[in-house]
Every structure is written in structure tokens, then in C-alpha cells.
Amino acid sequence: MRKMFLAGNWKMHYTSVEAAGVAKQIVDGVQNINDDVVIMITPAFTSLCKVCEVTKGSNVLLGAQNMSYENSGARTSEISPSMLLEFGVDYVILGHSECRTYLGDTDEVINKKILAGLKHPFKYLILCIGETLSERENNKTLDVVLNQIRRGLMSVSESDLKRIILAYEPVWAIGTGKTATKEEAQEVHRAIRLEIESLYSTSAADDIIIQYGGSVNVDNVGGLMGENDIDGALIGGASLKADSFLNIVNKVAK
């Protein structure tokens, strides 16, 4: 049985001191959570140093929001895998729609980042995929999402796939207050799992974690997580306050 992976993505919020404070509340709040739920928080790069002091030795995994596919060199403003590992980073989010939109990350670049990350001892790499509103309205959702998966996972072996988490985030639902219905989300998640079966194997498809992201909150998370092919959530705004994030965690962990 697959575990539930609940990841908070704090985006460009909080100073390092503020982030450490929220992290401490979350760490304290999930000490007795059952083993079937994995808790993850993803602060800004500038907060990793202080937050890692809070998460170290706890049952909360620490993540980064992006990284370079190069390990060093003339890459002004970028962060390398080795730099992230120095701060105890357990996982990295790659291919988030905001990075695709504002930073110009293409499927090819994201694939390079995935392959680079697999050469380092991260526990997980989260590959984000999702369609825009116009793509959904033109019935291109599955074409877009499955192509992003094929390109993002190019040259990834089945053994390495065990360290990959997929996160379906419809772009039109991120930060808008809109969310896919549980039926809409399940339809896409099922198609993703079948695509993994086609690319790899039935066992790989059965094992891979597929999160949902897009205005997840305490009111809709129960229905979403009740679907067969949804294995957790990548949570934005509702993860910024410890209380709201812990409410989601506790609802899923029941």
C-alpha cells in the first residue's frame, strides 16, 4: 500500500527566522503522526540553513524548490545539488509551473535536472506536471500531461524511478482558489499511472507516488485523498500557517 506524501511549498514567503518558527510548530505537531503519512516542507533557499536545524532528526523531510543541473560553474543565481545537500535537503521540487512560466524551464531542462538529481543522494525528486486552462478547455489535458512525463522521465531507469514522485498540478488551479473536482483529478492521476505502466511496468505503476496540487485545503483534501490514484498533496497557501497545514495532515492521517 502506498503512503500519503503531504508536501508544503512555501514559495517566496518568510524570512529565515519566520520559516524556522513555522517549521518548529509543524515538527512539534506531527511527532506522533502514523507512518503511513510522510510530511515534507519546502522553504525558500535562504531559509534552508535555519530550517534544517529544526527538521534534523525529526520525521519531517526538508525540500528545496528548484536546483541547477550543473554541480558548479558560471551559473549566476543558481543553486547546485551539492549546495542543497550541505543543508540536509531530502528532496527537490522540479518543473513547477511557476518555474516553467517565469524562469523558462523547458521539459528538456527539467529532464536534465532530474537526471542530475538522481546522481546525488536525495531521497526524492518531485516532478511537477500540469495543463493550463486553455489546454484543458481544448481537451488537451492528457496530451500535455503525459508528454511532460515522457520528456521529464527520459533516460530515467525503473530502479531510479523509485526516487521520483509525480505531482499533478493543473496550472489553472494553482493559487486561484479553484481546484479540480476529485473526479477530474482522479481521471488524470489514473491516466498518469497507466502511462507509467506503459513506460516501465505494472509494479512501477503500482508503486509510484502521484500527488495532487492546486488550491488544496482542509475542506477538499479528504475527498481528493479518498481517490484510488491520489497519493498525497503538494500544498501551497494552506501550508504557510502551521495550524492550517496541520489540520490537513490530521485529516489525511485519520
Curated annotation (Swiss-Prot):
Binding site for substrate: N9, W10, K11, G175, S215, G236, G237
Record bears the keyword Cytoplasm: yes
Subcellular location(s) per record: Cytoplasm
GO BP term, example: glyceraldehyde-3-phosphate biosynthetic process
GO molecular function: triose-phosphate isomerase activity
Database matches in SUPFAM superfamilies: Triosephosphate isomerase (TIM) (SSF51351)
Pathway: Carbohydrate biosynthesis; gluconeogenesis; Carbohydrate degradation; glycolysis; D-glyceraldehyde 3-phosphate from glycerone phosphate: step 1/1
Positions of the catalytic residues: H96, E169
Organism lineage string: Bacteria, Pseudomonadati, Spirochaetota, Spirochaetia, Spirochaetales
Protein name: Triosephosphate isomerase
Top-level taxon of origin: Bacteria
Catalytic reaction list: D-glyceraldehyde 3-phosphate = dihydroxyacetone phosphate
Keywords of this entry: Cytoplasm, Gluconeogenesis, Glycolysis, Isomerase
Main enzyme class: isomerase
Function: Involved in the gluconeogenesis. Catalyzes stereospecifically the conversion of dihydroxyacetone phosphate (DHAP) to D-glyceraldehyde-3-phosphate (G3P).
Protein family: Belongs to the triosephosphate isomerase family.
Oligomer status and interactors: Homodimer.
Main location group: cytoplasm
EC number of the protein: 5.3.1.1
Cellular component, GO, one term: cytosol
